[in-house]
Amino acid sequence: MKRAVIFSLLDKDGYADGYVLELLRAMKEQADLLVLVCRGALHEGTRAAVEEAVDRVVINKDAEAHNYAKALSEVGEIKGMDEAVFLSSVFFGPVYPLAEMFAEMEAHGDLDFWTLTPHGFSDRYPYPYEPLPDISEQSHMSFVAFRKGLMGSGKFTQFWDILTKPGRESDEASVANGELLDDITGYFAQIGYRGGSYITPSGGDDLNPFHMLHMPKTLFEKYRCPLFDIRAFTTPKHRILENTFGEPAGDFLRALESLGEYDVGLIWEWLIRAAHPCDFVNALGLVHILPTSTQIPEADPIERNGLKVALFMHLYYMDLLGDSLAYAQNVPASMDIFVTTSSEEKARSIEAAFAALPNKVEVRLVENRGRNESAMLVGLADIAKSYDFICYYHDKKTDLIEPASIGRSNAYKLQLCTLPSHVFALNTIDIFLKNPLLGFLTPTEPNHAYYSKTPGNEWASDFENTLRLHGELGLTAPIAEDRYPVASYGSVFWFRCAALKRLFEKGWRYEDFPEEPVSQDESLLHAIERIYPYVCQSEGYIPAYLMSDRAAELEILNLRESLRQVNLFAKKNGVVETLGALLSHFDYQLFRGQKALEKIDGAGDLSAGAFLKAKVKAGFRGKGEK
């Protein structure tokens, strides 16, 4: 069977990540003609690699939904092939040989078209995915193979003519076009063409409308699916929770890594370059919960690996010196301690209190302008580059919140999540060593009492000043106001020094920081507090959350009780069903394709209502079906 493959590259800058190049090379082995189509020019950084991997490159200057149509119009040989596979860069793989899939589907010569998995979205279950990071806000046909008979038909030509008719070149009009593409198989099935899918889940697996999003591990282990949607690693958590416990992406990545047949580093490479940190941290469950009393490594990982590790502390409140000393006493003797403070008198008190510690201890005087942030970025910048890993701590006192126990509990949580014991410190270093991409570990945001408003309001009024700092530092990590920062709210955290290199090398001066009194929001200090994960990601590392086992015990039950109280309030006020619907289907009313489909209702044979309800009738027993 002579086969063409049209590959739609969706990156807005025309950049082909490693996972894209890997897939192109594998597809080339199965194709007589491999055409890549891109909206706009290819990125110079990967252009040569792309041109080497494919037979033809087609540049589309219209909306992305026109990519396939552009390739069809410019490469006439495609329609003469026995089969043409339309594939986009939402997929990565292959994790199993593509030859298996193509050999099996060649045996079904009665099909006019086929897909990888059954088409799943409907009016009951709206399309769940976010668009890929850094591409325009629309969805795309990701994988469908058309046979020669269908491609030579008038209906096939009519479909693409309607898609590209004058007036549909803009991105706004292309939203509707994207929805047409998403249910192209439903359309051709509706008008009498015979379709099928390589994988036909059964035995209860078929009840899930979004196989790629909600059951990738099952598709991988049970059905030997060769390709997977990379958006499973970035789809916002609330959409995953609509139908699962939240486990799909993380469990799948671990299973993929354990098999060892696919380089998962290609996935991480793309996530670090193009994905919002909160999306992949949530989807993959990047929370390291470490024991406080059981040492994971057999020996001190600092001494065993010849590492340099330090505790940086900024101490301002001498009435909290006892608490700060207790925190420092949890540091292994193999770690150095550097303390900054604002006066000679305080320095003498700290030196006296810390004298009994077995560690190397150095106390430095710093200006109070910029508080704890300048203390580290100015006062300790010269030595930060000499260390491999650093734990950063500063004493906290929140006088503006009453009762005082609220602020003290926040400080307690920060301590409990970063340095509750000597063993915990060693376990944290061990986690860094086992995860070479890990760059920044922070406690989760405070969420008790006064702080319960923080989740959902993580930026507060600080997005614009953080965005400004993001630009000043020349950061490349994606940042957006509708994506919250994986930040340390309270500035107590662990980090790999190489991951924050750019921040320390900026050359900060005390004059860069605001004088006292500092506003409660919208200051440089608040921007720095939120910028750490973006610096980390821009340096090629990932941020994640860190908790002790005791902190996790408290957090889980606290959040459960918070949700329980919300439900009790809803029950008391007669809105429990409304709340339940909201919590289980957050985005149902926001299904972005609904209005787009309404715009094209009545366009010839392309009925929007029919598109939304059409189901592909396979007509054969597909892979996995008994």
Label each residue range with its predicted role.
Residues 1-623:
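ER/Golgi luminal nucleotide-sugar-dependent glycosyltransferases, focusing on the catalytic module
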